[in-house]
């Protein structure tokens, strides 16, 4: 329940077998299996990016244990990217709310997205509809460096056209699916 909706969000990327995918804030690689299910091992490629070397060490172990040969791991700051290439799809899976300069991370995602590409953000929302429990959840998440009271959806709509935002589980989380024109 804590990290609800990963499969649905990855499906919204609209991946093809030959897609080139970037996951920003990949952490330990928990989303890799969902993404790789859509990619052909010889044609599609997944690049996992994270700021934390410790998280990437765990992701590296996961990749090696499963024998995934079409996964690259990069340690970098999502707000200052220069990967030298563009991607068909970019995914933020419960990571945007942990990035202090999150607008810069979204701008960098836009720069690294190919024309016609898709960016999907799946993250915690404001918990509207949770009544007196909302501040408790937000406080607990803040202890874990997750900030939910920022206008993520508004920035997505500003940067990506079209952009569709949906809320799930009474405002527990949201998906924002944005595109960059042809």
Task: For the regions a language model picked out, list residue spans one by one.
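Short glycine-dipeptide loop
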Residues: 18, 42, 113-118
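Class I SAM-dependent methyltransferase SAM/SAH-binding core
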Residues: 22-24, 28-80
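A short acidic, Gly/Pro-enriched loop at the edge of an enzyme's catalytic core
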Residues: 79-90
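A short glycine-rich, Lys/Arg-flanked "PGG" loop and its adjoining helix->strand segment in the class I
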Residues: 103-115
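Conserved alpha-helix/loop element of class I SAM-dependent methyltransferases that forms part
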Residues: 1-17, 34
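C-terminal alpha-helical "lid/dimerization" subdomain adjacent to the S-adenosyl-L-methionine
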Residues: 120-174
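A short SAM/SAH-binding and catalytic strip from SAM-dependent methyltransferases
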Residues: 89-101
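C-terminal lobe and adjacent flexible extensions of AdoMet/dcAdoMet transferase-like proteins
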Residues: 176-182
């Amino acid at each position: 329940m804590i990290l609800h909706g990963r499969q649905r969000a990855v499906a919204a990327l609209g991946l093809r077998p030959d897609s080139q995918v970037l996951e920003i804030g990949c952490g330990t690689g928990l989303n890799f299996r969902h993404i790789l299910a859509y990619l052909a091992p010889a044609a599609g490629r997944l690049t996992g990016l994270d700021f934390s070397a410790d998280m990437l060490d765990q992701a590296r172990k996961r990749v090696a244990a499963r024998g995934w040969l079409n996964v690259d791991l990069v340690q970098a700051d999502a707000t200052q990217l220069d990967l030298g290439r563009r991607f068909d799809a970019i995914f933020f899976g419960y990571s945007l709310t942990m990035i202090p300069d999150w607008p810069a991370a979204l701008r960098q995602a836009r720069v690294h997205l190919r024309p016609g590409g898709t960016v999907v953000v799946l993250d915690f929302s404001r918990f509207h509809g949770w009544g007196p429990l909302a501040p408790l959840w937000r406080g607990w998440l803040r202890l874990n460096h997750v900030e939910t009271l920022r206008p993520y959806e508004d920035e997505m709509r500003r940067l990506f056209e079209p952009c569709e935002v949906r809320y799930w589980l009474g405002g527990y989380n949201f998906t924002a699916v944005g595109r960059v024109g042809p």
